Every structure is written in structure tokens, then in C-alpha cells.
Amino acid sequence: MEGTPAANWSIELDLGSGVPPGAEGNLTAGPPRRNEALARVEVAVLCLILFLALSGNACVLLALRTTRHKHSRLFFFMKHLSIADLVVAVFQVLPQLLWDITFRFYGPDLLCRLVKYLQVVGMFASTYLLLLMSLDRCLAICQPLRSLRRRTDRLAVLATWLGCLVASVPQVHIFSLREVADGVFDCWAVFIQPWGPKAYVTWITLAVYIVPVIVLAACYGLISFKIWQNLRLKTAAAAAAAEGSDAAGGAGRAALARVSSVKLISKAKIRTVKMTFIIVLAFIVCWTPFFFVQMWSVWDVNAPKEASAFIIAMLLASLNSCCNPWIYMLFTGHLFHELVQRFLCCSARYLKGSRPGETSISKKSNSSTFVLSRRSSSQRSCSQPSSA
């Protein structure tokens, strides 16, 4: 049974406007025409986003592999979030770029369904791995002993990936290679019922954006309260320890030292919380316009159909995949410092090993110079008595 055609949008949810990015027209009148100037700008921006996403996340994975603290829980979540961002770059940004260049999907039906499926897998994975990282930081602040005792991070990450793979299955049934005009085929979304686009876009918006943002807001609200409560208690404890040091001497100084050490540990945790909070903030800023435009386009029949608004929202959403590496660099700069040091060390070792002839010649020249200097000094020492 043929359903209602929606649209062949370049990324996973672009079902509502009726036109692909950079195109104008409607579905019933045949294939749309493209705004070439707008498409060229989009291709240039997507090339930059793809390069930054691939290079940035690859550097993060390489830095995490070479660091001495690779078994840290935070680094474990960072690794999988970088993998999810790479999935977004390869299976969302890259197909979008190719689709903008060719304007049509040139490939078999299986490839069409696979690409659309992996697009949503990356989006689900990046969202829920970020949510998992935030929950881990919440446990580390609110219940530190429990978070150390129950090391279920690997199981949680595995369950998250499996859940994302399952939740993305509808894409395989919605998208297929369809004839959109006489002799013109494209990777197209088809719904059995007219209300299908509304239901599907609303479900994706709830699952990927609204529900995670609510949970993230609750997590960081609780984290903020616990940090404020902790700092308040430490301020009171520090004041009491300072008074005790005046009265009890050494015992008071020991108590003050204990308070100072606890404050250092708390600052380390707060720093990781700040990092995850900035990542969450970047996620909200990048994805809010996209989901707003999507919901507006499917629920309001009078919504504007211009492609420029959808392209800006899509580009901003794609930008999220290359933001996270810079945030990691800002808060964990030692990772990249170690990576640069290892790179320079390996480069110097390679250059030193690739020029053995120059090395041996320099060694010989140094040794001959040393012998000549020894001989000249001995000659001077032997000639001194005779001159005297």
C-alpha cells in the first residue's frame, strides 16, 4: 500500500517542510529546483564542519589512548562520546555534504536505508552518552562512595549503544529509494497515514531532545545544590579549624590541613562538572533551533517553507559534533599537551633514525676534535717547562 510521501531531507528528521535543503517547489508538482548559490554556501560550511569534526574527535581518541590515566571513568565516557560524534560526522554530515553536491541520492535501496538508519543512530548515541556522562557526574558529586563501589559504566555504555541501535530501526521502514518524478529516483520518506510525519517528528523530538534536556536540567540542578551545600559546610569547617589552630596548636593545624585537602578534591570534581555542563549547553544551543523548526513545520500548516531557515538549523545542529573536542581541550588541556609531546618525541626519534650517516659523521668529527684538543693541550703542557 502506497503511503503519503513526506520529503527527502538530507538528514534524519527533515520530513516536514516538503522541500529538501536548498530547493524550492512542492512534492506533487515534481522534483524541486535547487538554489545553487545557497547550495554552494552549504557545501563550503559542511566541508569545514566535517574536517573539524573528524580531526578534533580523532585527536581526542588518540590523546585518550596515549594518556597515563586512560582508565578514568570520565575519560571512558569522553571516548564513547567522541566515537558517537565521529558517527555523526561520517554518517550524517558526510551524506548531507554528498547529497548537496549531487542533489539526488545515487545508490541502491539498501544503501539508502542504511545511511538513514545510521544517521539517527549517531544522533541518539551522542545524546544519550552525554546524558550518561552527566548522570555519572551527578553520582560522583551526590553519592561518591556509591559511584566508586558500583562500577557499571561499561555495562551502561553498552546498553546505551544497543538502545540507540534499536530506537533507530523505524528509519529503515520509513525511508527507501522511490521514484519522485518520471525517471527520477531519490531516498524518500513515505508514511502510511497523513498524520505519520507529525507522530514521527514529535516522537523523535521527545526522545532525543525534550526528555534528555529535562533529565539533564534535573541532574545539574541537583549537582548545583550539592556543590553549594558542600562549599557552605567546608567554609564553616575551615573557620572552625582556624579557630582550633589558635587554641590547640598542632592539632588545629592538622585539622586545617585535612579541610584543605578535601577542598582540592572537590575542585577537581567541580572542574569535570563544569566541562560536562558546557557540553550540555552546547548541545542545547545547537539542537534547539533544529527541533523547533521541525516541530513548527509539521504542526503548523502556515509555517514558512523557505529552505534557508531549515539549512541554518541543520548546519547549527551539525556543528555540535565538532564543538565537544574544543571543550575537552579547554578543560583537560594536559591530554593534548601529552599528545603533542609524544608526537614531537616520535618525530625527533624518526628524524634521528632516518639520518644514520649524518649521525656517524658528527660522532666522528666530535671524537676527532676531542683528540686534537687533547693533543694540543698535551703539547702546550710539554712545552711549558722548556720555555720556563
From Swiss-Prot:
Coiled coil: none annotated. It is a multi-pass membrane protein. Gene3D superfamilies: Rhodopsin 7-helix transmembrane proteins. GO terms for biological process: positive regulation of blood pressure; positive regulation of cold-induced thermogenesis. Residues 1-38, 98-113, 176-202, 294-308 are extracellular. GO terms for molecular function: oxytocin receptor activity; vasopressin receptor activity. Glycans are attached at residues 8, 26. The modification Phosphoserine is found at residues 365, 367. Residues 64-74, 136-154, 226-274, 332-388 are cytoplasmic. GO terms for cellular component: plasma membrane. Its main location: membrane. It is found in: Cell membrane. Belongs to the G-protein coupled receptor 1 family. Vasopressin/oxytocin receptor subfamily. This is Oxytocin receptor. It comes from Mus musculus. The lineage of its organism: Eukaryota, Metazoa, Chordata, Craniata, Vertebrata.
